[in-house]
Every structure is written in C-alpha cells, then in structure tokens.
Design a protein with these regions (language model features):
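Sec-dependent N-terminal signal peptides
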Residues: 3-13
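Outer-membrane beta-barrel channels and translocator barrels
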Residues: 16, 58-60, 103-107, 157-161, ...
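Short glycine/proline- and aromatic-enriched beta-strand/turn motifs that initiate or cap beta-hairpins
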Residues: 16-66, 185-187, 193-196
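Predominantly the C-terminal beta-signal and adjacent terminal strand-loop region
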Residues: 20, 74, 139-141, 145-196
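Residues on the lipid-exposed face of transmembrane beta-strands in outer-membrane beta-barrel proteins
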Residues: 25, 49-57, 69-71, 94-102, ...
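Flexible, solvent-exposed loop segments that connect beta-strands
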Residues: 30-43, 71-92, 120-144, 175-181
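Solvent-exposed loop/turn segments connecting transmembrane beta-strands
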Residues: 43, 59-61, 104-106, 176-183
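Helix-adjacent hinge/juxtasegments
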Residues: 85-107
C-alpha cells in the first residue's frame, strides 16, 4: 500500500502543474437547527471575501486534482422581533478538488470538480443590541468545520504559462447534534493560473 501511494505521489508531481490564485465573494447561508429540531427563518445570507492559493496537477490528460489554502469570510445577518443582528467571521483552511476537464477549443476549458474543505475560525463577532459578542468561545463557530460540495470553472489559457479563470463553488457543512449550525457558502471568484 505504501508503494502504491508513493508511486501515485511521484507520478502526480511529474505531470504538468499550475499554481492558481483567486479572489471572490462568498454568499453564505447559516442553517441553524435548534434542540427541538426547528429551523428558524430569521437568518439571511450575507456576503464576505474569498481568497485562495492552490496547486493543480493533471492525473491524466483530462482529469485534474488540486489542493491549497483558503481564507473565507462566512457572514450572515438577521433580525428577531425587529432587533437586527449580524455575524462577521474569518476562517482559514485547506481545500481540495478532483474532476474532469473538458477542452472547448481555442484555449478554453470547462472543469467540474468534487470538493472537500476543512477550516477553522480565526476571528468572529456577533453584533447584537449595539455591542459585539466574541464568538471564539462558541463551539458552533470555533470548532473545526468540514465542508463538501462541487465547483465549475471556465478557463482561458492566454499563453503556455498564464491562464485566467472564473469559478463557481458550492459547499455544505454537515454538523449533527441536538443544536447545530451549518454553513452553506456559494462562492463566485476570478483568478489567474501560472503553469510550470
């Protein structure tokens, strides 16, 4: 088993690689399930920044894998009985994706991937009744968060070393328990890729 894993890693590193940087916006929904099993409807999606730096490799001529680091703001707003509140959170984590690449000609390609991510909150506040509440001691925010989903990317190769792309990614977190908070970010981003 170790030999197979080593052979796979060596073969990936020997194939074509590119480094990708993207910037964009997360539109994040919070799905809160209380201890009675209800889903309150007072939460509304809000936008936040997305940054990522990743390395992409070819597994074959038309199959890609990537892994990298991400910075995300997963924000949300709402009101209860006309009392407004908001959540502002910053998460840093790791992400990976795997999927096929379809060449459309003239350097244009469409890539669909299955994605997985793990992230942890580095800063978070709730604004409520004209003051801020630190979320670092709230386990629903501060615990390690895993997410799963998919992405679609449209890319254009400018020259053999430089390409540009636009990407849509949808992720869901799956926390279970008597009272849970799940994040559902939809991310729109643009970026540049640098090939070796």
């Amino acid at each position: 088993m170790k030999r197979i894993l080593l052979l796979l890693l060596v073969s990936i590193s020997s194939l074509a690689q590119s480094y990708k940087f993207s910037v964009g916006s997360n539109i994040t929904s919070y799905v809160f399930t209380n201890s009675a099993g209800g889903n309150p409807s007072f939460l509304r999606p809000a936008s936040g920044m997305h940054l990522s730096l990743s390395r992409e490799s070819k597994l074959s001529k038309s199959f890609l894998v990537d892994y990298g680091i991400t910075y995300n703001q997963f924000n949300n707003v709402g009101d209860v009985q006309n009392i407004p509140f908001s959540y502002a959170t910053d998460f840093i984590g790791l992400g990976a994706g795997i999927g096929p690449k379809l060449s459309l000609g003239k350097g244009i390609a469409l890539v669909a991937k299955a994605n997985v991510a793990a992230s942890t909150m580095v800063n978070g506040n709730q604004f409520l009744l004209n003051h801020y509440v630190d979320l670092s001691s709230d386990s629903q925010f501060s615990s390690l968060r895993t997410m799963y989903g998919y992405s679609f990317e449209l890319s254009k190769q400018i020259n053999p070393q430089i390409g540009v792309f636009a990407k849509y990614q949808h992720l869901d977190s799956y926390n279970f328990g008597s009272s849970t908070l799940n994040f559902i970010p939809s991310t729109f981003s643009i970026g540049i890729s640098l090939s070796k």
